[in-house]
């Protein structure tokens, strides 16, 4: 009865195959490990992973005690301890991950198998709408995942897992937990979670969390030492600008160097608006029309040999005052809540959840300048995000004799991101997005060939506003279809996959819209055909050692910030100009990896090389305007390579 009920529910929701993972019997055969960080084997079937990702076998996991030990407020800082992974530096409250020197548009961030379709890739100071308190597992792929998710994951991906939709029964009919935490330098917070289950089919889950930080303390001052050096500030005008220090340095005539006081200055000082520097002269006479030469008055302050000018320096004053031993404007406020309902049967599950996430925080460092929001030149900057998301997920095992399992993932979210200068919104991003992913895995063919077929699509409607908006409103649609197969020829395994995709950007520009200047003023709708393919050969002579050679090729469509930015981008203190003439970016990578796991001992070695054609990057133009240096998006060929050892 349970099986037929769930089949009916799923067939109503789906008219095509769905995507999923191994069945419960296979999961029980999964090899146990005490390591908190492991490399996922193709034979280790996780309830959360898609089957195609297990076939690619590229991910490392962080979970359990290790995750609790390294977890911070941001995703980037949490995963930065992994070899080859760093974090962008926008303070303790905003840090996107950087994988092998790549970030932003090339590194995907996914929650429960769906990409986060937000605007944090546009600017590193923008928040990622995820409450790290609720994350219980992280998977990291340092290799390209463009085959599964498109070009936005061509440089790798970070997968976040939480229990917003329950897929397994809790041990008790009613269970929960309440936590409180606090520290002298990381704020205070707490969380609550409660689960209700009838022990047969249904689970209802409620959870919430909050976090507050007033400021972060540091051992020294918050700015670089040169910003407090009187001599360096006096000698370098650009340094005073970068440090946002008001320090006037100017010269005037030295009265003691001039023997005479000008009679012409005495008579015409007011009429000709003459300055104090015009008062003193080396001439003993001044000429007046109709009168002739007139003797100048001797300067009683005159001292022969004195320098002709005097340097004046005002005391340095920081535009935004900050106390020693603390990061200014480093506050954080966040809260989140989730409610979900799951139906679990013998052959799979179906779940629905609603999540609300709110956060606001200061951007430490320097305030924005020359913004249109206020006449006052410098104001502290803060960022806020409000995100509401609906998730629906389902999985069905053994949908047909020739199908292993199928599953689907869907989310709808509404998000509002604001960059605030003082209390006024400088840039506002309102986003509505739909995301859908379907995947079906077939049963093994000839007991050797495993594979999966998938479809995914993203719809993002971005509307921009604000005094300093540097992007137009854009509607983006992205679709992709992929197929991956793995042939087991023990001790060898051959894996291959191919993806075909399409991306479209449609502008929504009012008639009186300010298109900016430079190359960013040429705004036009664009569409791109994309693709990706993967070929990998694994050699596992013994269970504890795997050697793998892998090649990935992908074509990434340019993102909206690369195409359409056209004005001051205050997060980077630059003027940014996009280029809507861009074509796709090609990346071709090859990687050799070795993984040895014996008990609690793990040894990992990765050697990689990636060649880019049409790599998109910001280039300095040599021009400076009110917002700072002008940078234009450009493309070039690029090679990256490296060696990682853990």
Language-model-detected regions and their locations in the chain:
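N-terminal periplasmic accessory domains that precede
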Residues: 75-78, 95-98, 110, 125-128, ...
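N-terminal periplasmic "start-of-domain" segments of outer-membrane beta-barrel proteins
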Residues: 37-68, 104, 138
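Short acidic/polar hinge/loop motifs at secondary-structure boundaries
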Residues: 115-144
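Flexible loop and strand-edge segments within Gram-negative outer membrane beta-barrel domains
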Residues: 326-334, 347-406, 412-435, 467-468, ...
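Signature of Gram-negative outer-membrane beta-barrel scaffolds
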Residues: 449-546, 550, 557-558, 568-570
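Outer-membrane beta-barrel signature, preferentially recognizing the C-terminal barrel domain
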Residues: 378-399, 521-546, 550-612, 622-646
């Amino acid at each position: 009865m349970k099986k037929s009920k769930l089949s009916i529910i799923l067939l109503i929701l789906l008219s095509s195959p769905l995507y999923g993972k191994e069945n419960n019997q296979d999961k029980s055969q999964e090899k146990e490990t005490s390591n908190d960080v492991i490399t996922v084997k193709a034979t280790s079937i996780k309830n959360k992973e898609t089957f195609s990702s297990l076939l690619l076998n590229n991910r490392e996991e962080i979970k359990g005690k290790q995750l609790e030990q390294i977890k911070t407020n941001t995703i980037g800082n949490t995963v930065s301890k992994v070899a080859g992974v760093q974090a962008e530096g926008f303070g303790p409250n905003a840090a996107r991950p950087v994988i092998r020197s790549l970030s932003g548009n090339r590194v995907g961030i996914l929650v429960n198998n769906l990409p986060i379709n937000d605007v944090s890739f546009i600017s590193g100071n923008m928040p990622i709408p995820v409450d790290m308190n609720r994350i219980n597992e992280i998977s990291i792929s340092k290799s390209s995942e463009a085959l599964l998710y498109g070009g936005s994951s061509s440089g790798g991906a970070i997968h976040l897992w939480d229990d917003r939709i329950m897929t397994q029964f809790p041990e008790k009919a009613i269970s929960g937990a309440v936590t409180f935490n606090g520290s002298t330098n990381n704020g205070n917070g707490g969380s609550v979670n409660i689960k209700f289950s009838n022990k047969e089919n249904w689970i209802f889950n409620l959870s919430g969390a909050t976090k507050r930080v007033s400021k972060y303390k540091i051992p020294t001052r918050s700015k670089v030492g040169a910003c407090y050096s009187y001599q360096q500030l006096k000698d370098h005008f650009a340094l005073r600008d970068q440090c946002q220090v008001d320090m006037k340095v100017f010269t005037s005539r030295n009265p003691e160097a001039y023997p005479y006081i000008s009679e012409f200055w005495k008579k015409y000082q007011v009429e000709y608006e003459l300055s104090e520097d015009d008062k003193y002269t080396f001439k003993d006479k001044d000429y007046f029309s109709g009168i002739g030469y007139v003797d100048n008055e001797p300067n009683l302050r005159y001292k022969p040999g004195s320098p002709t000018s005097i340097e004046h320096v005002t005391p340095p004053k920081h535009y935004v005052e900050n106390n020693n031993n603390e990061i200014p404007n480093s506050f954080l406020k966040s809260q989140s809540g989730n409610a979900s309902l799951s139906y679990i049967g013998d052959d799979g599950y179906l779940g629905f959840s609603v999540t609300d996430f709110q956060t606001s925080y200061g951007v430490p460092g320097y305030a924005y300048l020359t913004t249109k929001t206020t006449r006052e030149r410098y104001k502290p900057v803060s960022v806020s995000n409000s995100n509401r998301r609906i998730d629906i997920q389902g999985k069905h095992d053994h949908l047909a004799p020739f199908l292993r399992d199928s599953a689907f993932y869907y989310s709808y979210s509404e998000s509002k991101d604001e960059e605030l200068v003082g209390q006024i919104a400088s840039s506002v991003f309102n986003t509505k997005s739909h995301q859908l992913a379907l995947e079906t895995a077939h049963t093994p063919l000839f007991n050797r060939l495993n594979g999966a077929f998938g479809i995914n699509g993203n719809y993002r409607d971005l509307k921009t506003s604000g005094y300093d908006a540097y992007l137009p409103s854009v509607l983006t649609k992205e679709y992709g279809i992929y197929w991956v197969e793995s042939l087991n020829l023990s001790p060898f395994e051959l894996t291959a996959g191919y993806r075909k995709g399409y991306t479209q950007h449609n502008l929504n520009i009012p008639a009186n819209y300010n298109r900016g200047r430079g190359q960013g003023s040429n705004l036009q709708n664009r569409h791109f055909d994309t693709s990706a393919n993967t070929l990998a050969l694994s050699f596992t002579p013994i269970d504890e050692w795997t050697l793998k050679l892998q090649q990935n090729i992908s074509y990434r469509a340019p993102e909206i910030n690369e195409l359409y930015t056209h004005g001051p981008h205050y997060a980077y203190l630059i003027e940014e100009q996009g280029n809507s003439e861009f074509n796709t970016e090609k990346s071709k990578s090859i990687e050799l990896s070795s993984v040895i796991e014996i008990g609690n001992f793990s040894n990992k070695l990765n050697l990689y090389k990636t060649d880019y054609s049409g790599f998109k990057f910001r280039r300095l133009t040599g021009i400076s305007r009110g917002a700072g240096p002008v940078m234009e998006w450009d493309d070039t060929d690029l090679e990256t390579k490296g060696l990682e050892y853990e």
